[in-house]
Amino acid sequence: MSNFYNNNPRRNTFRLTERIKKKPYQTLIVFILIFLFLYVFGPFGEKKSNNNNNNHPVSKTSSFTESLYTKFQTETFAYRANGDLKKYDISIITQFTVDRFDRIAMMADKWRAPISAAVYITSFKDIDEVFKLVRNSFAVTEFVDLHFLFANKTRYPVNNLRNLALRNARTEWCLLLDVDFISPLGMYDYLHSTLEKLDTSNNNNNNNNNNNNNNNNNNNNNNNNNNNNNNNENNDNDNGNNNNNNDNEKNFKKKQEDLKIDPNDFEGDLKAIEKLKRNGEKLYVKNLKKVLDGSENNLGKNINFNNNNNDNNNKDDGGGGGYYLNSDNSNINNNNKIAFVIPSFSSSISRFDFPDNKKDLLDFIKQDLIKEINSGVCPKCHGPTNYSRWYLSSEPYLVQYKWIYEPFLLYNRSQIHDYDERLKGYGFDKNSHTFGMAAAGFDFVVLPDAWIIHMNHVSKPWEGADTFNEQMFDCLSIVCESILPDAKSKNGYDPNAKLFNEPLKNNDNCLTREHW
């Protein structure tokens, strides 16, 4: 052993080992000093900040800035659904990672209509796993088109995935959902029926306009002769009617405030609304058909998924306050840009117990087994939906957009812009897109008999080593400095003026938690 040691060219190394064995505390000190140096100055060091409870610094890491415009390799229709999807006119748009594949199967099992899904692929193993899982779900094989987006060293590219799924949807009408949401059975049929009546409404309105134009041309001379005689009488009537309408609206709104709508006392609320109607008060909630084309005909007589009649079927909606339509529909845009709001909830109960009709849903809510989505985390994110009003509604109603509203929407994809692909990771991806829709003139109409429920799960980190806060405030910086002002400029608004109570560029209140 001694000869081997003395003759070995690496004997200096052995001697070093001998010395280390004799004085291990010296080596330990060296390792500690190296670790401290790397922790403070190296890649493991956490970027310190002097932020307060509300403010947060924007990450200056090169990985964040370099990834803003990263390109991704994609493969569209990596799997194409086997079913005949030509007969459908609405698709769900969603995105997910391979470990959430079971959720897309659950979604497809309830939706039973086209789904365009983008899958985030991080390895070849993911591809094998996808095709193995596809074979295990009949609903997926029949209804789901899968498009692959391959990872490229960035945070989770949520908007790249959404755009990939959206561009390759087989229908013009699309419902954007996260993969953890489940719809009730029959919701596709309800939405399809709503769109059918919307098309019929528009066609009838066009025909009526053509007929009216012809009649107007024939009657112009007669009308001109009669106008002078009727002017004085009309002026008197208009003044009287306007005064009556204003008085009725004020009285009804005051009585609504007196009702103090309680979402946990649905039966009492319904009785109070019925009492108002029996007293002959004028209600200011119009049905969707009148909102869109001025027709007096009803659109949705509370279309139920299972033909179960709720207590409030075919009743005018007394609402719970909120946004009222003017009698002349002056609130409504004339560009036919409509987005339908699907109220969203969350629950930890088994998905097999999720309700498929509104009456059962309300029972679960009263038992606190199903809750409004994000009500404790971000009340402003879904506040304009006005859940208290929705519980009682049997007809669609218009809501007023306000930043930071982020409902799940059914829209015509030909009318919207892409989701901003600079936003990667967690935060403000849907909020900012909805802001752009509002700036472009969209109306947001809540449907009374459609909803989705989030299947609660243990939170997992988003792609990337950065924290939730870092990802969220990095995204918020892009939203404040670029996305919001750009959306206003594109639609003819002053980028430096508030439009929907949104934060302004270079404002101290932008990078704070005050938004939500």
Curated annotation (Swiss-Prot):
Listed transmembrane segments: 25-45
Cellular localization per UniProt: Membrane
Region (Disordered): 199-250
Keywords of this entry: Glycoprotein, Membrane, Signal-anchor, Transmembrane, Transmembrane helix
GO MF entries: glucuronosyltransferase activity; xylosyltransferase activity
GO terms for biological process, alphabetical: calcium-independent cell-cell adhesion via plasma membrane cell-adhesion molecules; protein O-linked mannosylation; sorocarp development
Recorded GO CC terms: membrane
Entry keyword rRNA-binding: no
Pfam family, one: Glyco_transf_49
Family that this chain belongs to: Belongs to the glycosyltransferase 8 family. Highly divergent.
Name this protein carries in UniProt: Glycosyltransferase-like protein gnt15
Organism whose genome encodes this protein: Dictyostelium discoideum
